[in-house]
């Protein structure tokens, strides 16, 4: 960096295997302990292509690390309310506090744990996901999702807000529309927190769509 500018390290790579990256993160680019813990728990796998990343060692805000890359069959575990996923392909960009993913994946798996007991599996998935993370909460927004699964064609959107202070109530708003679908798959979209009575009523009331 030139005089008067903040020091910045720039990384550019055509191809990057994510599997061995997690153990090296702390030594290559030290981050706050809370962020490092999240990175370890995610246990990311897969491949990045066309990687662009900036590291500002003296920065104290979310711009300390910023990035953009094409994802190829990326997977990660659930942590801090964030979902688990497999076979994530698309374009990702962001920094330590916010980001977005433009998803275009085949054989896509998403698990909104612990809200839903089982992962959702789809033949094809296209979506826009945006997130923010700070010391108070993690927010994940999907303004549009279009997927193709065994149950039919699905359009959905959701907002999930998870508070770091567990004494505060978390929030979720999920809307799912099923076209040319099979009502047998209704239980797949029923949150685990529903009462047994309401869950049973929904299972039997929704037959097709």
Name every feature range the model reports, one short phrase each:
Residues 156-158:
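Polar/acidic, low-complexity leader/linker segments enriched in S/T/G and N/D
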Residues 1-78, 90-98, 102-151, 171-209:
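Extended amphipathic, helix-rich lipid-handling scaffolds
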Residues 87:
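Active-site pocket-lining segments that scaffold enzyme catalytic pockets across diverse folds
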């Amino acid at each position: 960096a030139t005089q008067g500018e903040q020091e910045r390290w720039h990384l550019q790579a055509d191809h990057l295997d994510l599997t061995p990256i997690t153990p090296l993160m702390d030594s290559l680019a030290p981050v706050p302990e809370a962020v490092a813990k999240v990175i370890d728990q995610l246990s990311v796998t897969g491949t990045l292509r066309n990687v662009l990343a900036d590291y500002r060692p003296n920065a104290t805000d979310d711009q300390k690390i910023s990035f953009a890359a094409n994802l190829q069959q990326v997977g990660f575990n659930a942590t801090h309310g964030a979902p688990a996923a497999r076979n994530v392909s698309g374009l990702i960009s962001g920094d330590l506090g916010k980001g977005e993913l433009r998803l275009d994946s085949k054989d896509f798996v998403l698990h909104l744990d612990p809200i839903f007991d089982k992962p959702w599996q789809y033949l094809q998935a296209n979506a826009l996901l945006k997130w923010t993370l700070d010391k108070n909460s993690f927010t994940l927004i999907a303004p549009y999702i279009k997927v193709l699964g065994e149950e039919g064609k699905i359009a959905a959107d959701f907002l999930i807000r998870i508070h770091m202070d567990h004494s505060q109530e978390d929030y979720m708003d999920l809307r799912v529309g099923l076209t040319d679908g099979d009502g047998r798959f209704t239980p797949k979209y029923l949150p685990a927190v529903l009462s047994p009575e309401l869950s049973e009523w929904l299972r039997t009331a929704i037959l097709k769509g």
